[in-house]
């Protein structure tokens, strides 16, 4: 049998079986004939969808390295996306975001944010999709097995920078829209897009734009969808209802600006590095428990219902450990690992600026060093309170050393955690769409990382926000050999199409 016909038959069978099963659900079913046509279209055109992803991955839209060449690529990427949406019939505005001021005093233009609209039927609900088209730095010499900017398919895996974070999911949503358009079918819901090009650099100036547009562009929005994270397994889909926040700290210890010769001064100084190592060592113990007094005060007590949520999640610990390439985790059970990723704060030490870190030997005593660490915050933790607790703790530890050096603590980043109500109607619609496409219940997960835009939308726009990831846990976003599986990309396109139909049932 032709492989395409086989995929079509499998999709049709899954749809028919699941539509028969749907009598147990409270919401009406989407039109089965339309769903079948859309799925067939997506299967038949999947090679075209992969080709478009290849074209988008080829644009080196790196927002992290503030150099003119990459900034030009970012502008090109946003122009390509705007043109794609216009060809679908969307009303598109590319909003000028002004300049980005760099630490060295220079400035670079910020790529425009795309605000696009498809449909304005007052009888339909309006769903707004957020995505970003900038990527982390990538270089073949960093350990990539393929050119990071040439999408390469190996055993069903599509390797390339941005394939899963976030160009693939953005295109999956666009592909779902294009399927309805190609079949000359009305979109089940009104759709809006907000697409940026600076997420990897901290979404520069985006919050100001969202605030400015809350009573215009966002005024008719009923629901917001983000697809910018991963499943917790390789094969089972998930819905994300919470993320951790992030407080990033720097602690500077200084004797003088110049380094010292260890033969001349070793043994007669309060060495800044020794002070700093003691400070960093006071933050967290060998079991991962944070030693800062008061840090756990706002962490909500664990409930039986929450424990049952963790038990229901599919997580193969051996698979997870192998895909992570670590010998052992701090905890031995699925439930403990999930809780310490999602519902408890964590503290990570990232590096020391000013220390000798090159090959060879260099017998200097650094005159000034800066330690860098961050705390991932969980819901109900307060960023300002954490800043005070950390500063107070480090000052207390430093005072006991009786050092003549100077210590300065600063929090350079303070991003809030986010959590949503999983009984919200949008979440129930997403669950039904996942059942239709994948034939299984989704894992209801949180994300241990930080996605500031979710909290931003929740606080400014005051609408339901859901994260619907498409990529597998081993996609390697931000790392070498980032990929998205062809299966995830294509089935994710179907998921968004089914989601449109489910959301239509809410109005």
Curated annotation (Swiss-Prot):
Keywords, comma-separated and alphabetical: Carboxypeptidase, Glycoprotein, Hydrolase, Metal-binding, Metalloprotease, Phosphoprotein, Protease, Secreted, Signal, Zinc
Gene Ontology CC: one annotated term: cytosol
InterPro entries linked to this entry: ArgE/DapE_CS (IPR001261), CNDP/DUG1 (IPR017153), Cyt/Met_Dipeptidase (IPR051458), Peptidase_M20 (IPR002933), Peptidase_M20_dimer (IPR011650)
UniProt source species: Homo sapiens (Human)
Residues bound to Zn(2+) 1: 165, 200, 478
Gene: CNDP1
Entry binding sites for Zn(2+) 2: 132, 165, 228
Protein's UniProt name: Beta-Ala-His dipeptidase
Entry-listed glycosylation sites: 322, 382
Active site: residue positions: 134, 199 (proton acceptor)
């Amino acid at each position: 049998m032709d492989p395409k016909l086989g995929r079509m038959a499998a999709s049709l069978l899954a749809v028919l079986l699941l539509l028969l099963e749907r009598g147990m659900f409270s919401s009406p079913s989407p039109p089965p004939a339309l769903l079948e046509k859309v799925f067939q279209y997506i299967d038949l055109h999947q090679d075209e969808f992969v080709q478009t992803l290849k074209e988008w991955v080829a644009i080196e839209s790196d927002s992290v390295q503030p150099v003119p060449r990459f900034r030009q690529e970012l502008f090109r990427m946003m122009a390509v996306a705007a043109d794609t949406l216009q060809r679908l019939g969307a009303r598109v505005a590319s909003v000028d975001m002004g300049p980005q001021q760099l630490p060295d005093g220079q400035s670079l233009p910020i790529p425009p944010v795309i605000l696009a609209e498809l449909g304005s039927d007052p009888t339909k609900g309006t769903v707004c999709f957020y995505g970003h088209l900038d990527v982390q730095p990538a270089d073949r010499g960093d350990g990539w097995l393929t050119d990071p900017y040439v999408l390469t398919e190996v055993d069903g895996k599509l390797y390339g920078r941005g394939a899963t974070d976030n160009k693939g999911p953005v295109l999956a949503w666009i592909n779902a829209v294009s399927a309805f358009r190609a079949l000359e079918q009305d979109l089940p819901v009104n759709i809006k897009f907000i697409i940026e090009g600076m997420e990897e650099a901290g979404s520069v100036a985006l919050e100001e734009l969202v605030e400015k547009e809350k009573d215009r562009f966002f005024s008719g929005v009923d629901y917001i969808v983000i697809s910018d994270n991963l499943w917790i397994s390789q094969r089972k889909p998930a819905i994300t209802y919470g993320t951790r926040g992030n407080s990033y700290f720097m602690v500077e210890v200084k004797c003088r600006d110049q380094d010292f010769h260890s033969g001349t001064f070793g043994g007669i100084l309060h060495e800044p590095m020794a002070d700093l190592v003691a400070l960093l060592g006071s933050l967290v113990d060998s079991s991962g428990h944070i030693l800062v007094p008061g840090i756990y005060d706002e962490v909500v007590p664990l409930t039986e219902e929450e424990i049952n949520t963790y038990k229901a999640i599919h997580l193969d610990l051996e698979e997870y450990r192998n895909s992570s390439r670590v010998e052992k985790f701090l905890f031995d059970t699925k439930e403990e690992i999930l809780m310490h990723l999602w519902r408890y704060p964590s503290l990570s030490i990232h590096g020391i600026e000013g220390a000798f870190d090159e090959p060879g030997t260099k017998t200097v005593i650094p005159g000034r060093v800066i330690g860098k660490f961050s705390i991932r915050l969980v819901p109900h933790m307060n960023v300002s309170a954490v800043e005070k607790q950390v500063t107070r703790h480090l000052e207390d530890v430093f005072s006991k050393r009786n050092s003549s050096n100077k210590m300065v603590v600063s929090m350079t980043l303070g991003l809030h955690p986010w959590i949503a109500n999983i009984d919200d109607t949008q979440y129930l619609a997403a669950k039904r769409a996942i059942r239709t496409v994948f034939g299984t219940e989704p894992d209801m997960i949180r994300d241990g990382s930080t996605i500031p835009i979710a909290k931003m939308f929740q606080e400014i726009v005051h609408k339901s926000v859901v994260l619907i990831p498409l990529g597998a846990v081993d996609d390697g976003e931000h790392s070498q050999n980032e990929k998205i599986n062809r299966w995830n990309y294509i089935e994710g396109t179907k998921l968004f199409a089914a989601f449109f139909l489910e959301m239509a049932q809410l109005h």
